[in-house]
Design a protein with these regions (language model features):
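Residue-level detector of anion-binding/catalytic polar loops
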Residues: 11, 116, 146
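Hydrophobic residues in well-ordered beta-strands that form the structural core
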Residues: 14, 39, 74, 147-149
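Short acidic/glycine-enriched loop/turn segments that link adjacent beta-strands
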Residues: 49, 121-122, 154-158
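Conserved PLP-binding catalytic core of the aspartate aminotransferase-like
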Residues: 100, 112-143, 166
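PLP-dependent enzyme catalytic core of the Aspartate aminotransferase-like
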Residues: 142-143, 152-185
Length: 185
């Protein structure tokens, strides 16, 4: 794909924000002219207020980006987090593996309910319930359970993107989804 984009005069930007969940899939070691990789150092840590990321690109691209960079691109909190990251690599890898196991269990349980699930190595599942989920999403919201609809992805209302949480949180969501969608049938 990169070659095709480069040959057409374009540049390819790869978003690896969740790459810590599937580190073998990274392309950051293959950066060359016309290929830029952006990543986050805080997604796996679940600290959304901390903006800490990186860009891997050819030296010329980095120079162009530095010309436009703001003076204070890293705040003190993000800097402190960055300083601690190397000491926690084993924990981060273990968390990613544990999350994968939770995702596999969550997907199996949803599939047993008849939901078509597309899983990957990120902490989300794409779930096709086979019918419009608009009312279910409203009922979930009323119970302070938030799920992501997929209309902004161009998918119909029968799809939801479900975050993989703890087993207890996943079980609660499945219980409510079952009650909302399958008990009445």
């Amino acid at each position: 794909m990169h070659r095709d984009v480069r040959n057409s005069g374009g540049e390819l930007i790869v978003d690896e924000a969740f790459i810590d969940y599937c580190p073998d899939a990274t392309v950051r070691h293959h950066v060359q002219d016309g290929l830029t990789v952006v990543g986050s150092l805080t997604k796996i840590l679940c600290i959304p207020g901390v903006r800490l990321g990186y860009i891997c690109a050819a030296p010329e691209q980095i120079a162009r980006l530095q010309e436009r960079a703001v003076t204070w691109s890293l705040n003190v909190l993000a800097s402190a987090v960055a300083a601690e990251l190397p000491r926690h690599q084993a924990e981060i890898a273990a968390d990613a593996q544990a999350n994968q196991a939770r995702a596999e269990r969550f997907a199996r349980c949803l599939q047993e309910m008849g939901v078509r699930v597309t899983a990957g190595c990120v902490p989300f599942l794409l779930a096709d319930f086979g019918h419009d989920m608009t009312k279910t999403v409203q009922h979930l919201r009323a119970q302070h359970i938030l799920v992501r609809t997929c209309d902004s992805f161009g998918l119909p209302a029968n799809y939801l993107r479900l975050a993989v949480k703890t087993d207890a949180e996943n079980d609660l969501l499945m219980k409510v989804l079952y009650r909302e969608n399958f008990d009445a049938r």
